[in-house]
């Protein structure tokens, strides 16, 4: 990581793993899908790790699930990652976009206030008023940029976006074309270049979400991201992630192993009991691995 990026609170994957990406691209002899930076085997190695090439594992997930996701994107289908909050859906979408496009900067954050111009395009109103609609006055949003440049676009928490705004994706996912009715001639039609696709994420258990239309659902392949089932893997992840956060916070020590083990066991027990119909109060928070990492970080800072 270059010196100017040392003080970033959270460096993007393209910056954090730039050396690994360069190494994989240099050693990649397999054919790449059109518009991709890496082949499918190299993209898999980037996400799941490869000890032979000294590539780190970046997420705990089934290898078969990653392979299905890569095949979905390679065949031009949109990918929808669904699951409970805190299951690393956003991290996984960032890693997939970085492996395919070289970066994951084209991101739409869904929310109740998200509008269509934040997804597709807007206008520089000074130029629009003085010179009328033109390509110079058009301000491209992430979806426009992704189609123009042939890159992956991430749509985080798509179900938090109003239904009528979600459906603006239909034409881009099916016909791979965006119509700009304000312009004339060739500029009024933007055709997607090779490499363009959409990775969306949605929470299955959360408040303030909207149902997706059946038409939009048909244009995505759905992949469920499950919580980490293996205790040892979850403990290792919490330990490594909390240690990295503590080092970033300038804390010289780590959380003791016994404390981490108790923390992870408590979270797992609460998750298991929360799914049962018992007399205990219903949990109002998702006891996810990400939340366990946050608690471990706070414990380390407080100690």
Predicted regions span which residues?
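AAA+ P-loop NTPase catalytic core and its hallmark functional loops
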Residues: 2-250
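Conserved AAA+ ATPase small/helical "lid" subdomain
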Residues: 63, 242-303
